[in-house]
């Protein structure tokens, strides 16, 4: 059953806070099932942060159900350039988010369900959570071949991944979250989670590729709505709580004091890109010159998302050495970003003489450099 998480009743449903807040009073005796009314990844991730940081989960676990508009979500210690096609994402308006848990990169859209299981650190148990999801799916489709693996994934028919998993363990609280593919755009997923960038050297956590499949490909009745209700029912049964899904607005400061500042932080360039572990790009590309090709070599070190070392080499007969030197100097300290690079190269472009051929080569070089960002 879905009920609105209104100001009238929310105060009596939620757990005690570790710190005082106007939005919460009284207690919940056992546990709670929440579902977000927002499809914004940053606000939904902020709910995870808020519950982890502020709620007393002792004897009162929480299940949080949420879905997002098209988004690629990377793990805390990952490199987005290594994990996904950022250029395609920009073209298609797909968001990029970095979560606070580890693990690999996943694609979210409205055909994917996200489940977050909150407990105390002592009660944290990923395998039990996944077994609960398996029971929920089998309750709807008894003959469904779905199993949890030692890697804490869920496999359909022994080979197709329908759920990936990640977690965060704090001093007292912990959460385990996982995806559940019901009707995700599989073609789009595959295109977005394929990095086109060459020559990246990084110690960042790398995702493990896997064959994926939607539950609806197996059984068209396994829609997101059906699966959400099944998981909620099984969770309520397992934890002996009321089978009510409480709808929440993750932007409501009266219920979640301070939550919007958490969402804003998760949207910043400094968090999404700046938290990328140090990496380098060592690559080259060719450009046409007088019916032949010349090679441009590029070596860039990136730290905290900013260019620390830049060495772009082009043959003297194609582009004067001093121009490459100016470009290298200008890029050092800037964001490893096509937007910032466009601004910097446009400023430099104005300083060169009105030579059409030189300007053409300059534009070609700059477009190639932006293409690796």
From Swiss-Prot:
Known regulation of activity: Inhibited by lipoyl-AMP analogs including hexanoyl-, octanoyl- and decanoyl-AMP.
Subcellular location(s) per record: Mitochondrion
Keywords, sorted A to Z: Acyltransferase, Mitochondrion, Transferase, Transit peptide
Amino acids binding (R)-lipoyl-5'-AMP: 107, 151, 161, 179, 208, 210
GO biological process: protein modification process
The BPL/LPL catalytic domain, residue ranges: 57-243
Transit peptide, residues from-to: 1-25
Activity response to pH changes: Optimum pH is 7.9.
Mitochondrion among keywords: yes
Function: Lipoyl amidotransferase that catalyzes the transfer of lipoyl moieties from lipoyl-protein H of the glycine cleavage system (lipoyl-GCSH) to E2 subunits of the pyruvate dehydrogenase complex (PDCE2). Unable to catalyze the transfer of octanoyl from octanoyl-GCSH to PDCE2. In vitro, it is also able to catalyze the transfer of the lipoyl group from lipoyl-AMP to the specific lysine residue of lipoyl domains of lipoate-dependent enzymes but this reaction may not be physiologically relevant.
Family, similarity comment: Belongs to the LplA family.
PANTHER family: LIPOATE-PROTEIN LIGASE, LIPOYLTRANSFERASE 1, MITOCHONDRIAL
Identification of the protein by name: Lipoyl amidotransferase LIPT1, mitochondrial
Species assigned in the record: Bos taurus
